[in-house]
Structures are given as C-alpha cells and as structure tokens.
Amino acid sequence: MTLRYICKELGISKRSLQRKFSIYLKSAPKFSIKKNQNAYLAIDGTYFPGDLCLVLYYDSHIKYTQLYRFSDKERFSQIKEDLLNLKALGVEVKAITCDGHRATLKAAREALPGVIIQRCLVHIHRESNIWLRKRPINQRSKELKAIVNLIFNIKTHNDKLAWIKLFQQWFLDNEEHINQKKINATTGRWWYKHKDLRRAAIMIKKALPNMFHFLDDNLIPKSTNNIESYFGHLKDTISIHRGLSRSNRKSFITWYLHYKNQTRR
C-alpha cells in the first residue's frame, strides 16, 4: 500500500495526508502493560537505518507486546532493567524464548533467576546452515548438517533423546578434528582450522540444555518466529514512508506497536 493509493482511497491530497501523519508522529502513544501471572515472553531485537535497534518483549500466549525499547543494539544492562520493570509491574515471566544473544541470556538469568530459557530452534537451524554452507563438501559438515536438519522433527521426549544421542556421538567422534589449530610460525598467532564447522558444533553444544523445554510445556514457543514475522510486516510498512527522521521513525514504530496491541484487546 503506497501513499498514492491511500490518498486515492481517502480522496485527499498527498500534502494533506502528510500533515495528518505529522500530527501523530509528534506525540507517541502511551504504552500499557498487562499484568500476567504466567507470561511466556519472546524477546528479540531488529535493526533499522541510523543505528536504531528495537528490542521487543512479546507475551506469546496473550499475543501482546508488553514492552519495547529503542537503543543502538541489544544491551545487557537495558534488557535486565526491562525485565525487572516488567516483574515490578505485575508480569511474572514463566519462560523466555530468545535467539541466544549473550546480552539477553545474561540479563534473563540475572533479572529472573530460575526462569526457563528456550533457545529459538529456527535460529539454531538457520545459523548452523549458514556456517555449514548450502552444499557442504566436507563429510563432517554434511553429517552435522543432516543432524541439524532433523531438529523440526522432534515432537516427543523420545525424539529428543534420540537426537541428542546422535549429536553427542557426532561431537565425540569429531571433537579432535574441530579443535585443530593453525599456527603462524612467525607471529605465534593461532586460529581454528575448521572455524565454521566448529562454530556450528559449539553453538549447538552450548544451546543443548535449553533447546527442548517446549516439550514439557506446550505454551513455550520453540522459536521467535512470531516476533520475526511481526518485524517483517513492520519493516514493510515503514518502508513506504521513506525519509522519516530518526525521531519520527521511532514515533511511527511506537504507533504501529500500539495499534497492533489494540487489535488484541
């Protein structure tokens, strides 16, 4: 939908429509938090031009954005503060689904000790496949890629145990290989010889304890897809309004979040 289309539908000029928009953009709406004794949060950040990062705290079960923050990136201190504020305002977080960003993991553990953290399976699958390549040549990479691609088939605890056993056996068989190093004889500097394969394997190994909590509670989202689709639509919408200043872009996003929440009431 373009400005030209909206003007045609409303029967007004582009300048008149822009004036109406500017009135809204000058003052962002107030955000309200819904008390929830069993909140299942999905937390994720996305980036816009001009070093603008939007961090969203989405209550998955009630489909409501409880809180948002504008920043330059996902920061531990800010996310921790946000989680503490949510708790103080009556949002009792039972579980958090996130992509594994260090700032989010650390903030969740410090602000909400004992909270269940579910790692986003879509993120693990996507990142692993990026590092392992679309068509890996190395046999070890092919094997790990095949294991990773089974993630979405896990529906039961037996499936989980079988998958974990498969991955752990692969890791045991290939640990020496993925830890091989190259050393520069002149400088003494070293690096991992199979860097990308190692990155994929270590990421999965570290995430493993928090990959399958959704099997114990079906209200726990196993991915942050709900937020990512949210972000996708937001970016499509804001792309129509090119040329917004940073402050107007923030105001536009706030109005978008506000109206999305209104539809959930």
State where each predicted segment sits.
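Inter-helix linker motif
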Residues: 112-136
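RNase H-like nuclease fold core
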Residues: 9-102, 106-114, 207
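Residues within the helices of the helix-turn-helix
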Residues: 4-8
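Acidic/histidine-rich catalytic cores and adjacent linkers
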Residues: 94-105, 112, 142-265
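Short, amphipathic alpha-helical "recognition" segments used to contact nucleic acids or chromatin
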Residues: 1
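Helix N-terminus capping/helix-initiation residues
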Residues: 11-13, 75, 120, 156, ...
